[in-house]
C-alpha cells in the first residue's frame, strides 16, 4: 500500500520541534512505498500545482495530511491546496479520483487535549473542528 504524506507547516525548520521530528523520522525510514512532501518547501509562494498534486494523489492508496492546528483550522497553504486540488470534476461533482483512498490526519496543537472537549476551554472536540476533512474524505 503506497502512502503519501503531505506536510503543511509554515515554520517546519525553525519553529516546530514536534513536526520537524515527525518529518525527519518519516524521511529517515526510506520506505519505497512512502512519499513525504514538505508542501511549504514545494510551494513557498503559494501557487499550488494542481496537476502535480493530482498525480501524487492518484498514485497513493493512503493520504496523510500533517499540519499544526492554527486558530481552530489548518494553515493557509493547506486551505489553498484544498481549493486548487480538491476540485469539481476531479474529486467530486462527477469526479471520483479520491474514491477508495484512505485519509488520515496528523495534527499538532499548542494546547492540551483536555481543552478540546465539550466541557473544555474551547467547548468543541477535535473531531468536530476537523469535520470538514471527514466530509472531503467521504465525498
Name each model feature, range by range.
Residues 43-51:
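Structural motif
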Amino acid at each position: 500500500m503506497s502512502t503519501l504524506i503531505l506536510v503543511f507547516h509554515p515554520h517546519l525548520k525553525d519553529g516546530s520541534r514536534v513536526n520537524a521530528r515527525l518529518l525527519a523520522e518519516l524521511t529517515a525510514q526510506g520506505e519505497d512505498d512512502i512519499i513525504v512532501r514538505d508542501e511549504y518547501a514545494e510551494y513557498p509562494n503559494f501557487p499550488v500545482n494542481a496537476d502535480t498534486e493530482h498525480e501524487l494523489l492518484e498514485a497513493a492508496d493512503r493520504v496523510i495530511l500533517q499540519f499544526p492546528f492554527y486558530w481552530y483550522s489548518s494553515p493557509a497553504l493547506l486551505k489553498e491546496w484544498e481549493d486548487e486540488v480538491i476540485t469539481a470534476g476531479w474529486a467530486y461533482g462527477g469526479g471520483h479520483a479520491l474514491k477508495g483512498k484512505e485519509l488520515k490526519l496528523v495534527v499538532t496543537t499548542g494546547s492540551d487535549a483536555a481543552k478540546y472537549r465539550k466541557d473544555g476551554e474551547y467547548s468543541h472536540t477535535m473531531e468536530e473542528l476537523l469535520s470538514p476533512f471527514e466530509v472531503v474524505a467521504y465525498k
